[in-house]
């Protein structure tokens, strides 16, 4: 779809859905190709999978996405596989997610997608993201959009696997490479922390910026990261370009070593997290 302010989806699930399995599917060529930035209020968005628990009383439960290949998705500022809002119990495993222009897999709060939802349940939780291969989730896939229309020449902001205001999710045994960032436990919310998650036994390598990232969406939100564990992961040869430590709209000087993010990055509002036994 080339129209502004539209949101093409490959698969859309909402309401009180439950007991759904997607297995051995291919989802590809879902694209928003409009050349709209945010300067005038227009936007570009698409999803391969969009799961929104938008009922305050009953969550979406028992959702499984496994052995699927998801690729060639132009999401704009949205995500490729999105689990958000009142979702309680899900598994994403043995999938391959690659060659997409922004975030690969996200487990999120419903602040934006389910605005007005009950804050006590408006976040995805009790999930497992396991044994997936996630690669080339990068703004470099669509430099014409990110560098041209979005006017951000140092845009390396896409994350392979991302918990953003979600909770109680295990991320394990995944391989993530050639993404802008590999794994994020971050919050783009002022009211929902990313909390009580476990990142373990993953291999992340050759990513443009940091391998594993915790804390606020720097300079924008204060939800933070709490009660999470980052253990027994292997991180190799990440941080290939400079980071965004100055918080200036991801527009770091990519040649400035002082602006480097490193293999593991902690931003503001990281509380009661444990990082141990990682091989770097």
Where are the predicted features?
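Outer-membrane beta-barrel pore domains
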Residues: 196, 204, 227-229, 235-240, ...
């Amino acid at each position: 779809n080339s129209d502004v302010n539209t949101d093409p989806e490959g698969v859309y699930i909402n309401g009180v859905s439950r007991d759904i399995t997607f297995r051995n599917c291919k989802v590809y060529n879902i694209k928003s190709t409009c050349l709209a930035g945010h300067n005038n209020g227009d936007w570009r968005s698409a999803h391969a999978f969009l799961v929104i628990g938008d009922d305050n009383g009953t969550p979406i439960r028992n959702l499984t996405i496994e052995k699927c290949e998801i690729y060639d998705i132009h999401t704009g500022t949205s995500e490729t596989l999105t689990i958000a809002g009142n979702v309680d119990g899900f598994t994403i495993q043995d999938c391959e997610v690659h060659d997409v222009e922004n975030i690969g897999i996200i487990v999120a709060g419903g602040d934006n997608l389910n605005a007005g939802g009950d804050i006590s349940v408006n976040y995805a939780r009790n999930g497992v993201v396991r044994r997936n291969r996630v690669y080339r989730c990068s703004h470099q896939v669509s430099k014409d959009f990110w560098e041209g229309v979005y006017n951000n020449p140092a845009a390396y902001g896409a994350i392979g696997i991302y918990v953003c205001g979600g909770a109680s999710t295990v991320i394990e045994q995944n391989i993530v490479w050639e993404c802008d960032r590999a794994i994020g436990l971050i919050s783009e919310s002022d009211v929902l922390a990313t909390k009580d998650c476990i990142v373990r036994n993953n291999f992340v390598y050759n990513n443009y910026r940091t391998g594993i990232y915790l804390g606020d969406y720097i300079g924008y939100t204060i939800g933070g990261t709490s009660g999470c564990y980052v253990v027994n992961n292997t991180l190799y040869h990440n941080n290939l370009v400079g980071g965004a430590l100055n918080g200036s709209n991801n527009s770091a000087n990519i040649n400035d070593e002082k602006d480097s993010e490193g293999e593991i990055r902690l931003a503001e509002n990281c509380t009661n997290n444990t990082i141990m036994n990682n091989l770097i």
